Amino acid sequence: MSDIEQRVKQAVAEQLGLKAEEIKNEASFMDDLGADSLDLVELVMSFENDFDITIPDEDSNEITTVQSAIDYVTKKLG
């Protein structure tokens, strides 16, 4: 598991009250992990702070699964 993957899963776990080791990469934040729209906004802010990146609103709409968050952060960190 990459450092980015671990950090994304940890942020998701903290935000949604889950255990990081139980979070699967293919899990949908809303459908599988029970997140609501406010949780998603807070997750995006958490990713921005944790990785020191900026995620525009139009991009945040594409971050719907754990894997899409990992892929997005990886791309932004280049």
From Swiss-Prot:
Subcellular location(s) of the protein: Cytoplasm
Residues recorded as bearing O-(pantetheine 4'-phosphoryl)serine in the entry: 37
PROSITE patterns listed in its UniProt record: CARRIER (PS50075), PHOSPHOPANTETHEINE (PS00012)
Entry-linked InterPro entries: ACP, ACP-like_sf, PP-bd_ACP, Ppantetheine_attach_site
Role summary: Carrier of the growing fatty acid chain in fatty acid biosynthesis.
Disulfide bonds: none
PANTHER family assigned to the protein according to its UniProt record, in alphabetical order: ACYL CARRIER PROTEIN (PTHR20863), CARRIER DOMAIN-CONTAINING PROTEIN (PTHR20863:SF76)
Name of this protein: Acyl carrier protein
Entry-linked Pfam families: PP-binding
Keywords: Cytoplasm, Fatty acid biosynthesis, Fatty acid metabolism, Lipid biosynthesis, Lipid metabolism, Phosphopantetheine, Phosphoprotein
Pathway field: Lipid metabolism; fatty acid biosynthesis
